[in-house]
């Protein structure tokens, strides 16, 4: 196997893992693979040849060594490395396949064309108010142009979690972390059952074909004990990093959920409604309407507050108050005229009725004059 393939494989694993995962990969390569290959070869190369028993019985040493070490330390650690890296390699293969498939045009989902947004035109109210003889549509469509996509910002450095989430690999990544934890715990328990925490300097063997109780002696027991404890520490450290990585992903996911929720609430926060000017009647509209009522013989009902809708300045309000007093007088005279109309028909041409008509004409003239002044002020 060429080293270039191994280097490319490690690069891909590093690109599709978080910051904690990269630390785990560094410790795994240095303290497990390199330490097992370099240290194990020099320490355990003569473990069976230097295993000496005080007997000359053929086959007794082999049987006693098998009882002392059912599985060699180095072979156990090599098997541990293979099984622990298996979930990571499977995850990497799945990630590369999915990314390559997403880049393929045949498997890429077809994006639907976005429907144009329809909004009520801002000039709709003015068009309805126009009397140009044209029928205005019930709904005026105003196509809102789509916002141009902003150019992507320069890639911000992050811990790799966003890239994993963007590629849709988060579930598979967490699954391989859980598998790694299970394997780590299983191998730690098996290592304790097989070897304990110390390599004994001697071993008492009573197996057949040994003729009697045989004492056997192990080469470099202290060095092997130190190396065994180092491997325990490395396994515990890798297990802690894996658990820390899962906690990191969980807390980061919760934090992103809260941020997304806060952003969603800020977007949906109700805005202050835009005030629109309520259209009002022209200044002389109510007066003309009252004149029509008088011509039809209906009893006039003057809206004493109509002046407030048309004029807003102080001078016009004083004029309106003065005219309102005249209107009250005119109303009283009109009531008397209607009450006595049947008994004396000629009463309608009396000076009182003429005075009422004069007052009404003065009111109409004042309102029209004031309305023309307001219109000139608006145009100016």
UniProtKB/Swiss-Prot annotation:
It is a multi-pass membrane protein. Residues 342-353 have a biased composition (Low complexity). InterPro entries: Connexin, Connexin_CCC, Connexin_CS, Connexin_N, Connexin_N_sf. Residues 354-369 have a biased composition (Polar residues). Residues 46-75, 195-228 are extracellular. SMART domains: CNX, Connexin_CCC. The chain crosses the membrane at residues 23-45, 76-95, 172-194, 229-251. Its main location: membrane. Pfam families: Connexin. It is found in: Cell membrane; Cell junction, Gap junction. Residues 370-380 have a biased composition (Basic and acidic residues). It comes from the Eukaryota. GO terms for cellular component: connexin complex. GO terms for biological process: cell-cell signaling. Gene3D superfamilies: Gap junction channel protein cysteine-rich domain. One of its GO terms (molecular function) is gap junction channel activity. Residues 337-380 are annotated as: Disordered. Residues 1-22, 96-171, 252-380 are cytoplasmic. Keywords: Cell junction, Cell membrane, Gap junction, Membrane, Transmembrane, Transmembrane helix. A connexon is composed of a hexamer of connexins. One gap junction consists of a cluster of closely packed pairs of transmembrane channels, the connexons, through which materials of low MW diffuse from one cell to a neighboring cell. Participates in a developmental pathway for formation of the notochord and tail. Belongs to the connexin family. Gamma-type subfamily. This is Gap junction gamma-1 protein. The lineage of its organism: Eukaryota, Metazoa, Chordata, Craniata, Vertebrata.
